[in-house]
UniProtKB/Swiss-Prot annotation:
Signal peptide: none annotated. Keywords: Mitochondrion, Transit peptide. Residues 1-93 form a transit peptide. It comes from Drosophila melanogaster (Fruit fly). PANTHER family: NADH DEHYDROGENASE [UBIQUINONE] 1 ALPHA SUBCOMPLEX ASSEMBLY FACTOR 3, NUCLEAR PROTEIN E3-3. Disruption phenotype: RNAi-mediated knockdown in thoracic muscles is lethal. The lineage of its organism: Eukaryota, Metazoa, Ecdysozoa, Arthropoda, Hexapoda. This is NADH dehydrogenase [ubiquinone] 1 alpha subcomplex assembly factor 3. The gene is NdufAF3. Together with NdufAF4 associates with mitochondrial complex I assembly intermediates during its biogenesis. GO terms for biological process: mitochondrial respiratory chain complex I assembly.
Length: 196
């Protein structure tokens, strides 16, 4: 009896609300590659991108000395990261970025859609941005010039979407720490010096 009353009230409530929803944005269909996220026995699976090596290389960490990738490889110095490979990049700072240091990217096959350049911890100078964009425009390659932290995140996102992307990264000179970083360091130190 109570269940029947609740169903009736629920139907009437929905009917009252439906006419009011007039301008609704359509939802996009779920891509085919997410069809594995729901198992038919009611279980939902979660995939953390930067631990999945099937999605290609991703930058999971950086320091003043270099970068850590999702396959646990640690690289020292500036690097060029591609979806399936990584190379050392022969620049010391953003002042060294010129047509010669970028000459690798237009010659790649298959052609990349986007080149992301992480220039350390400083904001990109307008003169550098203009020079790089004009050079890459000749080869019809889009360029994003960002701080290294933002460049790593952008590369990981585009790589997870299976875009043809490359990333050139210079390690930052200064790192910014947040409360979580300090807490993690304290916990690691406690585990290291903990004796039984």
């Amino acid at each position: 009896m109570i269940a029947r009353t609740l169903r009736t009230v629920g139907r009437q409530g929905r009917n009252l609300l439906l006419p009011r929803i007039t301008a609704c944005r359509p939802l996009h269909a779920i891509p085919a590659n997410f069809s594995k996220a729901y198992d038919h026995d009611g279980k939902t699976k979660v995939t953390i991108f930067n631990t999945e090596t099937d999605l290609g290389l991703m930058v999971t960490g950086y320091s003043q000395y270099g970068f850590r990738l999702n396959n646990d490889m640690v690289l020292i110095g500036p690097i060029s990261v591609f979806p399936r490979s990584v190379l050392s990049w022969n620049v010391n700072s953003f002042e060294d970025i010129n047509e010669d240091s970028l000459s690798l990217f237009p010659t790649l096959e298959p052609k990349i859609d986007v080149l992301i350049i992480g220039i350390g911890d400083q904001a990109p100078p307008p003169a550098l941005s203009k020079r790089i964009i004009e050079f890459m425009k000749k080869y019809k390659i889009n360029v994003e010039i960002l701080r290294t932290e933002q460049a790593c995140a952008t590369f990981n996102f585009l790589n997870a979407e299976n875009r043809m992307v490359a990333c050139a990264l210079i390690p930052p000179l200064h790192l910014s720490y947040n409360e979580n970083d300090i807490l993690q360091a304290k916990l690691r130190k406690k585990e290291l010096y903990e004796t039984e």
